[in-house]
Amino acid sequence: VSAQGGEPPTVSVSIRAASGQERRAEQLAEQLDGAFVRICRTGADAGAFAEAWQPWTRRATHHMVLDAAVRPHPRLVAQVHEAVGGRPRAALRFFTPGDGYASHALRLAAFAGYPWLLPPGPDPTSIAVVLPIPEAAEFARSVPAGDDTPEGVLLQRFAEERGLALLASTADLVQRDGPGAHAPATAFLPAAVAPAEWWRQDTLQAPPLIPVVHLRDGQPLSYEAVPGTSDGWRLRPRRDVPTPHARRFARVMHERLLGTEVARSHLRAAAVLLGVAGVLRDQLLLAAAWGRPSEGFGAAVARESAATLALGTLAEAVPAARRPDGAAELRETFEALYEEMTAILRGSPRPERGADP
């Protein structure tokens, strides 16, 4: 596999360490054995921002910026090299938090079997991003002093201005690992390794209508492309998605959800959970028109994307979802819903564990 000018891809890494994160950054650097790594102490000034993005070795074809407060995939460096080999001229994002509207677009891509998504507008998060070396240097120079715009928004703007594709991986290669209540990655699979050909498969363009969940109240909504608006997207009331086997879907949702401890935790919890399960159903129905995951890694990414749907979106609407036991119950329940819903779509009574959706 070659990157630029026939060279095999080589990635340098800058680890950003805020005050108090120095030891975490050192530990992360030790885990990235075999990569060119340096640690950048960050601050509020634009100089610290630019330092992290400025390439610092001539031996690299691409440059990655990582936050110190992450847990990397055990084979992060090897998988990034394979991904870069498949998409050498793109900006690549390897973490998408499971609570944003972009995560729902990413789930659609995963359910259809795609490794990459051209996301719906900017995502403020940018804790694991790779740029080709020339673009990384240009991006480092492009941020004006005193600009407090979120880095992910700046990256999106930069990519659009330079005609650079900014792609989000449906398989996350890092997980947040710091204090505080943060949404999990959309699909972090530390025990699974993508085959090299995975990263060379097609990219899904974010569709103009994405079923999503409102973060504050857990209600189903539609995230829609609206030309002429500032970022091109707006929240709208939920749109009906044509649903074959509607009664079977409803029965599965009620059977799986209404008996859970989380559903019984307070007055609105059951209704909220049913609404979120309806979003999963709608996403699966839309994705089925574009494809389905292959056996093995693609199916694992899709299953994990479903398992995190409620975890990423219900922390405010259903307090029990924040407890470890509640989160574990929701993960298990939504993974089971995914299996049963995909079985309905295929017309079989129930799939074997790990079967191809």
Region spans (language model):
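Conserved catalytic core of nucleotide-sugar-dependent glycosyltransferases
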Residues: H73-G152
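A short, glycine-/small-residue-rich helix N-cap motif at loop->alpha-helix starts
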Residues: T42-F49
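Hydrophobic targeting segments
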Residues: P9-R16, F36-I39, A69
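Short beta-strand-to-loop acidic/aromatic patch adjacent to the donor-nucleotide binding site
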Residues: A60-R71
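C-terminal catalytic/acceptor-binding lobe
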Residues: A3, L154-P357
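Short, well-formed alpha-helical segments that are part of the catalytic scaffolds
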Residues: I15-D33
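Short, acidic, metal-binding catalytic loop of nucleotide-sugar glycosyltransferases
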Residues: A3-P8, Q27-F36
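Active-site nucleotide-sugar/metal-binding loop of Leloir-type enzymes
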Residues: A50-H62
